[in-house]
């Protein structure tokens, strides 16, 4: 039986490693983890997200995922707004869906350096 989620992979073009580290590591604050030796030559980068992982993998014929996306849970509404400000300060567009769509949840959408959609989510009391 399934007991959890191990990792999510997003695709990126060849040569993506430094941009992956700058975006997912520095900007979003994820911890980079070492790829297994047999996989390191394929490029990309891996990051820890609590007890799960985000894998940025090199894809031949890359095209961004504009609908499918990872959704990262953040600790608070204040953290969500801080990350929104950081994304915007670095030139990334941020959109904020209506809280009415999922009551009790604040969300924002943005894109990584290659146009893959990402979502950031914070739980809040309904109506705030």
Could you tell me what each predicted segment is?
Residues 1-21, 70, 126-128:
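N-terminal beta-strand motif that seeds the catalytic metal site of vicinal oxygen chelate
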Residues 1-3, 90-128:
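Vicinal oxygen chelate
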Residues 7-9, 46, 69-71, 107-109:
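Short aromatic/hydrophobic contact patches that present stacked aromatics
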Residues 11-53:
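Core segments of cupin and vicinal oxygen chelate
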Residues 16-19, 78-83:
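Short, conserved charged micro-motifs
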Residues 22, 26, 83-88:
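Short amphipathic alpha-helices in soluble, non-transmembrane regions
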Residues 32-34, 55-56, 92-97:
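A short linear hydrophobic-aromatic micro-motif
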Residues 39-43, 64, 101-106:
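Short acidic/glycine-enriched loop/turn segments that link adjacent beta-strands
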């Amino acid at each position: 039986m399934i007991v959890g989620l191990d990792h999510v992979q997003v695709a990126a073009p060849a040569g993506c490693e430094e941009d992956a580290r700058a975006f997912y590591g520095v900007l979003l604050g994820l911890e980079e983890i070492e790829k297994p030796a047999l996989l390191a030559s394929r490029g990309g980068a891996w990051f820890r997200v609590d007890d799960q992982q985000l894998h940025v993998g090199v894809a031949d014929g890359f095209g961004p995922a504009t609908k499918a996306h990872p959704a990262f849970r953040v600790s608070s509404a204040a953290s969500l707004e801080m990350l929104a400000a950081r994304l915007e300060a670095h030139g990334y567009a941020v959109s904020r869906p209506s809280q009415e769509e999922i009551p009790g949840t604040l969300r924002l959408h943005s894109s990584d350096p290659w146009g893959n959609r990402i979502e950031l989510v914070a739980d809040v009391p309904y109506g705030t």
